[in-house]
């Protein structure tokens, strides 16, 4: 276990599986006390059990990132039981894919609420303590789709592009207090979802990726861990693409 994040408290949303789970594990292995969120009690309990088995400080909590009162209560509990988060990883996200002419208003609104508004709200309530401490790391998980678009994902692309703009604006506001704000933008990452794709679909994806392979959750978590580290204190307002060369803009 490393110690580059010793004495730091990290809040990771969407920490039950996939990228969020690996980010929480890596930050914990670097010495941070990690609070990772899930949408159900069962999910939060699984996070806590995984942490205990791995020797990671921290635990899982239930959080609906679209519920302002729940976010406020979650932060107050973390502050009272541990300390204010000095690292915030806004990872929770959903998709509601559909061609625009078939997309329902509620599908647009749901994606915006979870993928964009929650980033604004959690960043806002965590920021005050970071500014007082004159240290903080806010890392938002976006997507290559926010840069290049993808048919059937106008809601998701708009939300992720919005997070990128939010990140750059906030970075300018808080840089003088030693708080950095950055994005990590994954490309196509190997997950349970991609494992279920047909071989022809996988091949079509790989043809778009110069590296010739799908990314791993470890690829993404490594980028997040670097941006959270003391060594990244002079990096802010950046979008770090982790996509095997699929997007180079």
Where are the regions a protein language model picked out?
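Active-site helix of classical SDR
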Residues: 123, 159, 167
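Conserved glycine-rich cofactor-binding loop
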Residues: 16-17
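Substrate-binding pocket helix/loop in short-chain dehydrogenase/reductase
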Residues: 99-100, 104-112, 194, 205
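Residue(s) in the substrate-gating loop at a strand-loop-helix junction
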Residues: 143
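Alpha-helical segment proximal to the catalytic Tyr-Lys
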Residues: 128, 172-176, 233
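Conserved glycine-rich Rossmann-like NAD(P)H-binding loop of the short-chain dehydrogenase/reductase
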Residues: 30-46
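Short, small/polar-rich loop/turn modules that mediate ligand/substrate recognition or access, typified
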Residues: 175, 180, 235-237, 243
């Amino acid at each position: 276990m490393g110690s580059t994040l010793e004495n730091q408290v990290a809040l990771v949303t969407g920490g039950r599986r996939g990228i969020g789970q690996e980010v929480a594990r890596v930050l914990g292995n670097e010495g941070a006390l990690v609070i990772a969120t899930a949408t159900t009690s069962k999910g939060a309990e699984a996070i806590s059990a995984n942490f205990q088995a791995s020797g990671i400080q921290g635990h899982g909590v239930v959080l609906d990132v679209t519920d302002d009162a729940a976010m406020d209560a979650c932060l107050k509990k973390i502050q009272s039981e541990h300390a204010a988060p000095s690292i915030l990883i806004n990872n929770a996200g959903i998709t509601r894919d559909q061609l625009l002419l078939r997309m329902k208003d509620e599908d647009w609104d749901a994606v915006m609420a979870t993928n964009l508004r929650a980033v604004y709200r959690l960043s806002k309530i965590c920021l005050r303590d970071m500014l007082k401490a004159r240290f903080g790391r806010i890392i938002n998980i976006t997507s290559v789709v926010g840069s290049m678009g993808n048919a059937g994902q106008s809601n998701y692309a708009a939300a992720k592009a919005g997070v990128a703009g939010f990140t750059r604006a906030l970075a300018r506001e808080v840089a003088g207090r030693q708080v950095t704000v950055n994005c990590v933008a994954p490309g196509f990452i190997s997950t349970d979802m991609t494992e279920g794709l047909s071989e022809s679909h996988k091949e079509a994806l790989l043809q778009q990726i110069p590296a010739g392979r799908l990314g791993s959750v470890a690829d993404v978590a490594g980028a997040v861990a670097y941006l959270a580290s003391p060594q990244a204190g002079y990096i802010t307002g950046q979008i770090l693409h982790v996509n095997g060369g699929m997007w180079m803009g």
